[in-house]
């Protein structure tokens, strides 16, 4: 088929097609930097709240760290004070124990020193010839006087009503002359020391 026939039938001639050239708009070239500057600040507007929140959290954390450090310092101060008080208490306790021991030793030494003359008199009474009752009685009176000055007092028994806090009943005996519960005889004298019973009196009680 000839070209003329193809033209008549509306066909375009075969062959390589031409690319259409796109013409760029006329004007000055576009600067990328100016485009970025003139772009709407959408990205910065989105990150601003996040940065602000981050700053607030950091400030809160810093404040919490300061408060925690203050609490730790206060705790350490209390612990140091407690350790000092404990050490002072322990030292005071030891001093009091030493002082109490010293007082006990001094009191015992003083009592023994006062009893030595009584011991000497007993030795002399045993060496004496004849009846020694008077010498022993005098020695007993001397010993009683020394002990009474230290706080020793005898417990009243005969004729008293039985008191279990200071009396020990070793026997009960019917009696028409005494009321029930009355002490009618003392087997062994009891003593009080500074107002406290150190040995109960052993007695016979009427029933």
Swiss-Prot record:
Q: Where in the cell is it found?
A: Cytoplasm
List GO BP terms, alphabetically: protein folding
Keywords linked to the UniProt accession: Chaperone, Cytoplasm, Stress response
User: What's a single GO MF annotation on this record?
Assistant: protein-folding chaperone binding
What sections of the sequence does the record tag as coiled-coil?
none
Q: What does this protein do?
A: Participates actively in the response to hyperosmotic and heat shock by preventing the aggregation of stress-denatured proteins, in association with DnaK and GrpE. It is the nucleotide exchange factor for DnaK and may function as a thermosensor. Unfolded proteins bind initially to DnaJ; upon interaction with the DnaJ-bound protein, DnaK hydrolyzes its bound ATP, resulting in the formation of a stable complex. GrpE releases ADP from DnaK; ATP binding to DnaK triggers the release of the substrate protein, thus completing the reaction cycle.
Give the similarity note: Belongs to the GrpE family.
Indicate what this protein is called per its UniProt record: Protein GrpE
Q: What is the lineage of its organism?
A: Bacteria, Bacillati, Actinomycetota, Rubrobacteria, Rubrobacterales
> Which gene underlies this protein?
grpE
């Amino acid at each position: 088929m000839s070209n003329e026939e193809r033209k008549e039938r509306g066909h375009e001639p075969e062959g390589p097609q031409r690319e259409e050239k796109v013409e760029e708009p006329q004007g000055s070239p576009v600067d990328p930097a100016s485009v970025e500057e003139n772009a709407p600040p959408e990205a910065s507007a989105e990150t601003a709240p996040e940065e602000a929140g981050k700053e607030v959290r950091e400030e809160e954390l810093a404040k919490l760290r300061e408060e925690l450090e203050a609490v730790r310092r206060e705790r350490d101060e209390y612990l140091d004070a407690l350790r000092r008080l404990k050490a002072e208490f322990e030292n005071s306790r030891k001093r009091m124990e030493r002082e109490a021991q010293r007082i006990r030793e001094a009191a015992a030494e003083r009592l023994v020193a006062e009893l030595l003359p009584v011991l000497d008199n007993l030795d002399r009474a045993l060496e004496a010839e004849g009846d020694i009752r008077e010498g022993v009685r005098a020695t007993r009176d001397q010993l009683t006087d020394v002990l009474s000055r230290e706080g020793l007092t005898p417990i009243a028994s005969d004729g008293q009503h039985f008191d279990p806090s200071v009396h020990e009943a070793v026997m009960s005996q019917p009696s028409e002359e005494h009321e029930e519960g009355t002490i009618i005889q003392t087997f062994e004298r009891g003593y009080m020391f500074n107002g406290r019973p150190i040995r109960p009196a052993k007695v016979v009680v009427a029933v």
